[in-house]
């Protein structure tokens, strides 16, 4: 039985006006946005056509997302010899959408390399990254890897790093650079975050990458420091803890947590990396709005 045509009120994905079921079935938009009767295989092709016609509105973000993904894809190809593969594609898209999330994946899937390459993408857009690693050895390895990747990409980001092995003079230089936001990428340990939280909270950054978050979660002080670095106050943390206690009886608890979260992460993307999170931090997960990726 053939379904008769229908008109859906305020349902055009591009302008919000009325659109026919026939056009929607073809992956298209209303006749005000596109007078031609065309069929589209994907939303990117549709957005590109609307851009050509000068009628692109609500779908503009689709075109921008595709352009930025192409930039990241080029970075991966030039640095590694291949584009983002498998779950890396999903991780890239989520970062480009401005999502904060936790990567839970076994070793060998390129979680750390993904974080380093995304930091280079952000620096190419004049945006700062903070990378947190469990030990000074891994910080040193990551700095070396980042420098190699930068050379392959012919980029020259201002990379600074801090760990216990630096001289007093080197430590002072790093702290001065942090105070003045005179860097593109900063790599350090979770211990540094605890000891220098006030300094880091004044840093204007866009991307926070926490490698091996399991180690950070072993210390409540470390987990709390990372939440505060992300933009949450001690009051936010305590209020969330109390709301989680009430969640079984109060159906509005999670909505209240979501409202608390709104605006706190604005302009920032926070990504946690883990091989297997066996014991999570419910306050951190709730405040960050994490869902595994």
Predicted regions and their residues:
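N-terminal helicase ATP-binding lobe
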Residues: 1-293
């Amino acid at each position: 039985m053939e379904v008769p045509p229908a008109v859906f009120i305020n349902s055009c994905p591009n302008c919000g006006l009325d659109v026919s079921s026939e056009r929607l079935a073809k992956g298209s938009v209303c006749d005000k946005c596109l007078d031609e009767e065309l069929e589209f295989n994907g939303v990117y092709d549709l957005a590109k056509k609307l851009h050509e016609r000068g009628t692109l509105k609500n779908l503009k973000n689709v075109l921008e997302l595709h352009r930025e993904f192409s930039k990241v894809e080029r970075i991966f190809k030039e640095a590694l010899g291949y584009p983002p593969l498998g779950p890396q594609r999903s991780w890239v898209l989520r970062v480009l959408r401005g999502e904060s999330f936790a990567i839970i994946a076994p070793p060998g899937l390129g979680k750390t390399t993904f974080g380093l390459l995304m930091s280079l993408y952000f620096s190419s857009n004049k945006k700062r990254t903070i990378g947190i690693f469990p030990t000074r050895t891994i910080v040193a390895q990551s700095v070396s890897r980042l420098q190699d990747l930068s050379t392959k990409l012919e980029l020259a980001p201002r990379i600074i790093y801090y760990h216990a092995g630096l001289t007093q003079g080197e430590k002072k230089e790093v702290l001065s650079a942090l105070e003045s936001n005179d860097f593109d990428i900063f790599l350090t340990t979770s211990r540094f975050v605890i000891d220098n939280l006030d300094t880091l909270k004044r840093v204007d950054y866009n991307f926070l990458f926490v490698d091996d978050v399991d180690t950070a979660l072993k210390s409540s002080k470390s987990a709390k420091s990372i939440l505060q670095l992300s933009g949450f106050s001690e009051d936010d943390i305590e209020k969330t803890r109390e709301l989680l206690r009430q969640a079984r009886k109060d159906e509005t608890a999670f909505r209240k947590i979501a409202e608390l979260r709104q605006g706190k992460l604005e302009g920032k993307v926070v990504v946690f990396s883990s091989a297997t999170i066996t014991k999570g931090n419910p306050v951190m997960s709730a405040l960050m709005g994490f869902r595994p990726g």
